[in-house]
């Protein structure tokens, strides 16, 4: 059976939560820190924003180059190979910085946010996505280079320690991701991902966002009939009821740069 890249339900929920967050935040330019294959950058470019994606994984940037080829060709988007922590202070100034499933890989998370803050204009916004709930630490965290998971209060505190204001933290994908959590772990275990436990944290991190795991990140092409934004719309409505709870195994933090 041939498998192709199709976003799983949790990714659709994450993307919809980002759309919800953007409704209250203006801006025309963005920086995607740890852009991976570029799927969230594409969402922002589709919405008319102009941006830059940064990642230290050459393989991830190859995928992002293909994903965002039309926007790259017309100058609406560009890619930068490298670690954001090594970029100069004058690298860019944008209205919005996003970073999804990156900060949990970084030892100094407050310093990470302060670095990103340098690239956001005063009055601009930062949106951070991280694995939620410490009690959900699992094999998957140990194979993709995670250092920690965040309870809702943890993420709120880190954003405030970075001297950001108008802080808000949402639980994302509840109950969809929660219900699929153990199934997802089973798929990870049977895929051979456990072999990555012998890799360095950086090696694990480089491939964390571009894994091909059958029935988790890749599916038979016919599954598009089920996994699409239209058919999954009821899940988006339901997740909004849980944004202000601490139940999410994915947390999204939003804050303003003073």
Predicted features along the sequence, with ranges:
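A short His-aromatic
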Residues: 101-105
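Conserved N-terminal segment of class I S-adenosyl-L-methionine
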Residues: 1-92, 96, 100, 244-255
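S-adenosyl-L-methionine-dependent methyltransferase catalytic module, highlighting the catalytic core
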Residues: 2-12, 39, 85, 107-115, ...
């Amino acid at each position: 059976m041939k498998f192709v890249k199709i976003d799983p339900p949790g990714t659709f929920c994450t993307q919809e939560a980002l759309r919800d967050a953007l409704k209250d935040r203006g801006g025309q330019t963005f920086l995607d820190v740890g852009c991976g294959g570029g799927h969230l950058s594409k969402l922002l470019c589709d919405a008319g924003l102009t941006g830059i994606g940064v990642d230290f994984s050459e393989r991830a940037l190859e995928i992002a180059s293909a994903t965002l080829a039309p926007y790259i060709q017309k100058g609406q988007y560009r890619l930068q190979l490298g670690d954001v922590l090594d970029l100069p202070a004058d690298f860019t100034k944008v209205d919005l910085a996003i970073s999804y499933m990156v900060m949990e890989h970084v030892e100094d998370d407050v310093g990470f946010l302060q670095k990103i803050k340098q690239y956001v204009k005063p009055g601009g916004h930062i949106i951070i996505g991280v694995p939620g709930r410490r009690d959900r630490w699992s094999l998957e965290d140990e194979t993709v280079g995670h250092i920690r998971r965040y309870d809702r209060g943890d993420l709120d505190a880190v954003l405030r320690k970075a001297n950001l204001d108008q802080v808000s933290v949402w639980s994302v994908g509840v109950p969809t991701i929660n219900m699929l959590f153990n199934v997802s772990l089973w798929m990870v275990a049977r895929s051979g991902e456990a072999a990555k436990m012998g890799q360095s944290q950086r090696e694990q991190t480089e491939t964390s966002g571009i894994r091909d795991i059958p029935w988790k990140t890749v599916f038979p092409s016919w599954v598009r009939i089920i996994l699409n934004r239209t058919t999954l719309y009821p899940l988006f409505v339901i997740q909004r009821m849980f944004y202000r709870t601490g139940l999410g195994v994915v947390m999204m933090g939003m804050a303003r740069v003073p």
